[in-house]
Structures are given as structure tokens and as C-alpha cells.
Amino acid sequence: MTPAAFYKIKEPTRWAIAPDVFSYSSLNAIKRCPLQWQLTHSKYGDDEQLFPFRPSPSSVEGDIIHTVLERLFRALSLQRLPKLGSPDFRECIQHVNAKKTVEDLVKKHEERIAAHPRGNGFRLRLTSQQLTNKIIRIFRQQYSQVVENGLDLSSIQKLACQNIESEETLDPSFLLNKYGLLNEYKLKHPNIPFVGILDFVCLDSEQTVIVDFKTGKQDEDHLRQLLYYAILWWRVSGQVPNRIEVRYLGNVASFFPTKLDLESAEEEMKNEVASAFRALSEKPAQPSLGSHCSLCDVRQFCDTYWGEREKVPLDSIDGTAVVDLEVVVSVHASDYGFDATIPGGENACIVFEPGTGCIYGPFASGEHLRILSALRKHETGEVELKPWSEVFRV
């Protein structure tokens, strides 16, 4: 889909329906805003493509860091978490090759952005070397704590992931007892359409522990996610996990679930799935406004959001600020901007550099536009289209 065609999209060609099975992240996304989930999973244009997410430098860099850290911890976990500097440790580090992995991931993202209809203005803030250095700092700090205060993995056999994948139809508790560890193990609830991929399940002093490593801030929702995964383990294997554990930089959040805890959480899971099915049965689904709206990738399609925006006069915004603005072009645009009218009658002066105007223009008198992430200048009151701004026809 070309940028010219993309920015003229007004609604989906084919509306998304509820998925056959839900994940923890999809349930959370639907609960946050059913319309947002529906719009991001609907099909658009004559070729019925999914709506492309707006790339964000911070999120791309975060994904790269998380991916490499995850590969390092996974590889070292399968080697029973050897000590820093040991032969097994060095062998693992060389195999993962963090520097080359980062370079490959950066190249992959750059290629994707080059062909992305919303890739204008995208630049990573950190170089490949800076990303690698950041990963090494985080990894050294976290790995030392894991080894010193971590799990007893002495009983784990050294194995390749394929050994488990070829036996995934077996009882997971049997596999856990056989190998001592399961990595990225997928489980599906037998009665509720819910699926999860357990990053790390191990035997710690003969106790079953479900573990997840997080590089961000501590969040109670992370333990709740593992509690849902504990339900899957319980229902598939018949065994209640002894412990669930989220490992952060410098901290560990643990919970020791009982059967009663799992039964209560399972009822919540069942209700959430039913609620998600109901919410997605409407086309369009109902929106749920909140702090997430300003970062929503599909807010240009949400009439409720723009209705709320109309209630905030442009002149009431203090200081220089990034704004979303719905306007009607008053006169044909020049190479540097145009005058426009905001719903409600307020006038606005939209300005831009010629290069930016070429991307989203030409702008004709009477056109109805929804502008995302423009810069409202406090000194002049002008609204400037920046390289990261977007302009959609309504």
C-alpha cells in the first residue's frame, strides 16, 4: 500500500471478528478499548492488508533490547546458568553473538521502515553499538543477580529446544521431570479459548516454577499474567505450580498459588473471554477513551475521540504542545501552509516545510482532514506539520 493510498483510508474494507483463541495480551487490549483492537486487526484497501502500526524509535529499540536479552537468558538457562566467565558461559555468549544479532535486527527494521507507508520521519535514536552496550550493561547486572540469588538449576539437562518441540503432545509435567526445564512452551486451556506461551518453566529443588524475565518496571499485571499461565499448567498437567516468579533488574516478584487461587482466577479468565466476544460482536465496536488515546495508532478513525477533541479549544492549550487537530481547509494551500477552520468555527493556521507538504499534500479548499501529532507553537499560535506528523483525509 502506497502512502498516498494509505492516508486516504476512511474505514476498514473488512471488519475484524473475535479470534478463535485469546492470549493474555489480546484480552488486555480488548478490555482497554474494543474499537482499537478491532480497527488494528481489520483489513484495509482493495488488497485487504492489516493496518500498519506507526513505528516508534523507542519501542523498536526496546524490542531489540528485549529480544537479545531474551535470547541470552534462554541460551544460558538451557546451559544451567553457568557462572560469568566460565567456559560454558563464554560458549553461550559467542553462540548468541549479541553484537551481530543487534546489527541484524537493526537492518531488518530499517528494511521494513523503508517499505512502510508510515515510515516517514522514523530514525532510531541509538546506533547498533550503543544498543549493544546498553544490552551488555543490563545483562551483566541482571545475570549476576540471577546466578547469585536465583534458581537451583543443577538438575537440568543440557538440551536443544527441538528435543522438547518433538514431544510437545506429551504431558508437560512429564517433560519437565525429564529435562528439568521447558522453554517457550505453548499451552491451551482445554475448555476456555485461551492460549499462552510460557517463557520458562523449571524444577527448583523439585518444585515447579513458572518464570518470566522483565527488563522494564515492576508491574502487578506481570504476576497476574503468570497466574493465568499457571491455570493452563494446572488444567493440562493436573498439577498446581509451586511458584510463579517475575524477575526484574534488582528485584523478584513471587507468588505461591493455591488451587483456590487458580479456580478464582480461572473464573475471571472465563468472564474476560465472554466479555471480549460480546464487545467484538459489534461493528464498529464501542470505544473506550483514556490516556491511551493519544498514542493510539487508529485514532483517526474514532469519531468519539475527535468529538472529545472538539471540546478543547486550540487557544486554551498552554505553551508549545503536540496536538491532534480536525480541520477543513479554507483556501487552497501554498508550498508552506494553509488556513483552516476547526469544527466549532475556530480558525487555525497550518504551516509546514515544502518537503513535508509534498508527502501529505496537495491540500485543496474544502478538504476535511484529521491531523495527528502536529506542533502547536505558543508564540505564534500556528500549527506546524513535522516530519513525524500524519494527515488523514476524512
Enumerate the predicted regions with their spans.
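Nuclease catalytic cores
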Residues: 27-77
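Cysteine-cluster motifs in flexible loop/terminal segments that predominantly coordinate metals
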Residues: 32-36, 269-313
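A non-catalytic, helix-rich entry segment at domain boundaries
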Residues: 68-179
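Mg2+/Mn2+-dependent nuclease catalytic core
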Residues: 174-268
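OB-fold nucleic-acid-binding modules
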Residues: 304-324, 393-394
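Structural detector for short beta-strands of small beta-barrel domains
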Residues: 314-344, 373
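Flexible glycine-rich surface loops and low-complexity tracts that mediate binding to linear polymers
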Residues: 325-329, 359-394
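Beta-strand/loop nucleic-acid-binding surfaces
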Residues: 342-366
